[in-house]
Regions:
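Soluble FAD-dependent oxygen oxidases
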Residues: 2-506
Length: 506
């Protein structure tokens, strides 16, 4: 079960409720993912045997082998939200069957590909419609296309690209699936050069609330196609196939640099000065990282600074481009090497934090000034600590390049003109005390507020944050009204809904 077992889930129910901070949103009274409760449906008892008999895949119920793993969301902050069943779909017909069955009985449901929703929105107390087994990857070098099942993980995609000489921008975390990644935008170390994942979309298939299977492209259901390019997962239907544009690539180079904490201000300042004018073929993630203990959890904190990224060119050229950063302070650890695209992806890979976590993002139109850098450093030094080895920190991703070449309204993804995406994150384990958990949540919220003046009011919808106020404007900006119109057309009854789902236009 990862970091928690069944006893721990039960024993920590109170702490999980504190950590989730969502009251009854995911299964008590109030809004439920995919809930459609008619009076007739409430009188029906779900016929699980009937569902199992109609699936080409498999239905898992409590007590079945594999149920616990299949039912848990990746973010263990929401581990107390357990399904009544998990439909392991083998094909599109299974998706349609599971959806129709859940609607018939008025049972809460959610579709899950990788299960990495930061806000726990791929968890359900009813039926989880799992797309994990629909994970095919087909690369066609002749047509320069990549056809993906909705459950294809980043690691599956990179494995499929190995040796083909083509690439598509995908994410950093190996176990994130294409559905959530692409539907919320999707960025990675190749995005400044190749664009966002959603910008590569050529065609997708969508099962709508009515059970219809739509083939969606710029020529067919163009409004839904537009919405699938960054309008967020779980809003309009269940995507069951994606066709992406592939781009030929030769060798690339990669860098990973680390510094001792005393160099934090100098290094962060140098990176933030460099990237706005750096070639679009170069990417960067710079982080202020802390692990270990803290004043609340006890123990000794370990802090450091890291910068890493990809360059579509040689290591020699990359070394020259990095000179302003290398001269700002001497790294304690340095790697700058030529690699293949797939090798570089493996070297730069990092899992989303294990255990429980909170993440708060914002976009910046310009680099943090010196005062903002000092504020970020001071807050990292105040992290209260936890038992989670993933620790906490503040991260900035260089934006721009190919990402900014499309207009904010050309696709649903609106965040085109920013200079950086900033994310601050805190992690813990559910065995930590309620005091430690609350301190981490307060720390993340405090740091977010302290740096608010430097943001542009926007946030990344794939780093979905249940505590974010005005999330509609932050995630979707000027595209919100059009997204609501698309929702009204394809899901007028609001079947696909959760706490931060796009509502249909009235």
């Amino acid at each position: 079960m990862g970091d928690i077992g069944r006893r721990e889930v039960l024993g920590n129910a109170g702490k999980l409720a504190i950590a989730a901070g969502i009251g009854t949103r995911l299964g008590g009274k109030g809004t439920r993912p995919g809930q459609v409760r008619t009076a007739a449906a409430r009188r029906l008892q779900p016929d699980w045997a009937a569902l199992a008999s109609r699936l080409n895949g498999r239905l898992l119920r409590p007590g079945d082998r594999g149920f616990v793993t299949a039912g848990l969301p990746y973010n263990r902050r929401y581990a107390a939200v357990r399904p009544a069943g998990v439909a392991l779909c083998a094909d599109v017909a299974d998706v349609q069957t599971a959806l129709a069955w859940a609607r018939h009985y008025g049972l809460p449901f959610t579709a899950r590909s990788g299960g990495h929703s930061y806000g726990g929105y791929s968890a359900s107390r009813g039926l989880v419609i799992s797309l994990a087994r629909m994970n095919s990857v087909q690369v066609d070098r002749d047509s320069l296309t990549i056809t993906l099942g909705p459950g294809a993980l980043n690691r599956d995609i990179y494995a499929g690209l190995a040796g083909t000489g083509v690439a598509a921008p995908s994410g950093r975390c190996p176990t994130v699936a294409i559905s959530g990644l692409l539907l919320g935008g999707g960025f990675g170390f190749s995005s400044r050069h190749l664009g966002l994942t959603c910008d590569q979309l050529l065609e997708t298939e969508v099962v709508t609330a009515s059970g219809a299977l739509l083939r969606v492209s710029p020529q067919s259901h163009s409004d839904l196609f537009w919405a699938c390019q960054g309008g967020g997962g779980g809003n309009f239907g269940i995507n069951t196939r994606f066709v992406l544009r592939a781009t030929p690539v030769a060798g690339v180079s990669v860098y990973k640099l680390e510094w001792d904490w005393q160099h934090a201000a100098a290094v962060l300042g140098a990176v933030l000065d460099l990237m706005p004018t750096a070639p679009h073929s170069m990417s960067c993630r710079v982080g202020l990282d802390v692990t270990g203990g803290g004043p609340v959890a006890g123990g000794t904190p370990r802090r450091g600074v890291s910068a890493l990224g990809l360059y579509f060119g040689s290591a020699a050229e990359l070394t020259e481009l990095l000179q302003p950063v290398l001269k700002a302070a001497r790294p304690s650890d340095q790697l700058i090497e030529d690699r293949t695209f797939v090798q570089a992806a493996a070297l730069l890979a990092r899992e989303v934090p294990k255990g429980s976590f909170t993440s708060k993002s914002r976009y910046l139109d310009r680099p943090l000034p010196a005062a903002g850098i000092d504020t970020a450093i001071a807050w990292v030094e105040r992290w209260p600590g936890s038992s989670n080895a993933s620790g906490a920190g503040a991260t900035l991703f260089a934006w721009g390049g190919k990402i900014s070449e499309r207009a904010p309204t050309a696709a649903a993804f609106v965040h085109r003109d920013a200079a950086f995406l900033m994310d601050n994150e805190a992690t813990w384990l559910n065995r930590d005390s309620a005091r430690v958990i609350s301190a981490n949540l307060d720390w993340a919220a405090g740091m977010y507020t302290a740096l608010a003046q430097y943001g542009n009011g926007q946030a990344y919808q794939n780093f979905i944050d249940p505590a974010l106020r005005d999330w509609e404007a932050a995630y979707y900006g000027q595209n919100l009204h059009r997204l609501m119109e698309v929702k009204r057309r394809y899901d007028p009854d609001d079947v696909f809904r959760f706490a931060q789902a796009i509502p249909p236009a009235s």
